[in-house]
Every structure is written in structure tokens, then in C-alpha cells.
Amino acid sequence: MKIVVITSSPHPHDESTSIYLADRFTKGATQAGHEVFTFDAANSDTHPCRGCDQCHMDGPCIWKDDIENTLMPKMLEADLLVLTTPLYYFGMSAQLKTIVDRFYSRTGKLHGKKSILMATAYNRDDWTMSALVDHYDTLVRYMEWQDAGKVLGIGCGSRSLVEHSKFGDMAEQMGAKL
């Protein structure tokens, strides 16, 4: 299976809680024989959708950045897309939202894929991820994707907290069982 993992934390790799989940997922998926490509949205040349409709929802996008030149070709070939984000004000990071908005340029061509959501948050209330999950579920429905699972790391406000939680194992097992 071809998998694209999109990370979106602006924190350094070794400090990020959501990238930790992405790394653990990748470890499991790679060991299971899957081909994994990781795109770091926070440290790439990306531009937001301008809504100009030059792509006519069928590409290409007017922006010739890392989304168009690197990520989009990989996404079009992928069977599974993994969206990873720290929770920022009860939603996805701005870095991931920039990527999601650019799905517009290939809406129809991205239909039919599987997807996974992985997110981390400091807060541990049971409602912490509700708005993010609602957004993701709506995206899955609109894009005609199949939700392949979620890892919602509540109470993971630091790298140490996520490393000592159950969520890393959950992410790795999710990758291994694909």
C-alpha cells in the first residue's frame, strides 16, 4: 500500500507530540511492508488556496510550491492519506489547513482514498477533539474517502507525556495492521 503521511507541527521534530505519533505509525506501516512518504507541511514551501478557480478542481494549481510539485503527485498515487496535527484552538494547525484547502485543486482525483487522523492535545477532557473530529469526518464524507481510523492523543501536551501514553503504541499498531 502507498501511504502519504502529512505532518503539520511547527515544533522541532524531536519535541513535537503529533510528529511522534506519525513516526510511530510510519514504523509500524514500514515494518508491515508498506511504502510511506512523509510530507512536513510546517517546513515546506506552501501557499494557501486563493480561490481563483484556475484549477477548475482538476489541477494544476497556480502555486508552483511544494504542495503542487512534491505532495500532490504522491497523494494522487497514494492509497491512504494520514493527516497529523497538534490541536490548535480545537482545530487542525494552520499548516495542515493550508494543505487541506489545496485539495480543492484535485477534488475529484483524490476521491476514493482511505484516510487516518492523528492528533495530540494538552487538554484531556472528553470533548477536546470534538470539533476537529467533526471537521475531519465532514472532509472524509465530502472527499468520498474511507475513514481507516483515528488516534486522538488527549492529555499529550509534551513529548514526554505522549511518549509515556498509550497513543504511540496505538499509532504503531494502526500502521502495522493495515
Locations of regions flagged by a protein language model:
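Short, glycine-/small-residue-rich phosphate/pyrophosphate-handling segment
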Residues: 94, 107-150
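Short, solvent-exposed loop/turn segments at secondary-structure boundaries
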Residues: 14-17, 127-130, 160-165
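N-terminal beta1-alpha1-beta2 submodule of the flavodoxin-like/Rossmannoid cofactor-binding fold
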Residues: 1-84, 90-101, 105, 168-178
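Residue-level signal for alpha-helical context at structural boundaries
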Residues: 67, 99, 117-118, 133, ...
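Short histidine/acidic/glycine/proline-rich micro-motifs that form metal-
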Residues: 10-13, 88-89, 122-126, 156-159
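Generic alpha-helical secondary structure signal
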Residues: 69, 130, 134, 165-169
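A charged, well-structured terminal subsegment
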Residues: 136-154, 158, 162-165, 172, ...
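Short beta-strands and strand-loop turn motifs
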Residues: 6-7, 84, 117-121, 151-153
